[in-house]
Design a protein with these regions (language model features):
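Surface-exposed, secretory/extracytoplasmic low-complexity segments enriched in Ser/Thr/Asn/Gly/Pro
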Residues: 1-172
């Protein structure tokens, strides 16, 4: 009987082994940061300090096994299950993984507000346009990553890779 949990095949595994497989797949899930269309940093969910709560996962897997044992059929078909889980986060690991120096050699510019200046040369006032900066604000970046990963976990907890585009939500 083929069984997948959030798209991850755990067929033929006992509760403990399935739990290990799920936790490893979760922690090894790639997170790719892109800026201006190219990759600038790659890490994993685990390196960002995220993990699945072992107790919650074991309870959910045990309950699923009991449910499946009660409804055993001769010709069971493949089924994908979504079980209860809890994500834990290590703030210190996340801070260490999301420092500005991880994001390439690109020269970063400071944001500048629009302003009006008097040009002595032209003898008139000139509007200097606002310039969006590219300096990374680490706190804003962490909040942006947290929100992005939270949404990703709802859609694809264990499969695929997360792509995060650096933009104004992560800049100062």
């Amino acid at each position: 009987r083929k069984i997948t949990i959030y798209g991850l095949d755990v067929s033929g595994q006992n509760v403990e082994k399935a739990g290990q497989t799920i936790r490893k797949a979760f922690q090894d899930k790639k997170v790719v940061f892109r800026e201006d269309g190219s990759q600038v940093y790659q890490t994993t969910v685990g390196e960002l300090g995220y993990s699945l709560d072992e107790g919650t996962l074991q309870s959910a897997l045990t309950a699923l096994k009991q449910q499946r044992d009660q409804t055993r059929t001769f010709l069971a078909s493949w089924k994908n299950y979504e079980i209860e889980y809890q994500v834990n986060k290590d703030e210190i690991a996340e801070q260490a993984a999301l420092t500005e120096d991880h994001f390439g050699e690109k020269e970063r510019t400071e944001a500048q507000n629009a302003e009006i200046r008097y040009s002595k040369k032209n003898k008139k006032f000139v509007i200097v346009k606002q310039v969006a900066g590219t300096q990374i604000d680490e706190e804003r970046l962490r909040n942006y990553v947290d929100k992005t990963l939270e949404a990703e976990f709802q859609d694809q907890l264990l499969t695929g890779e997360v792509k995060i585009d650096l933009n104004q939500q992560a800049y100062k």
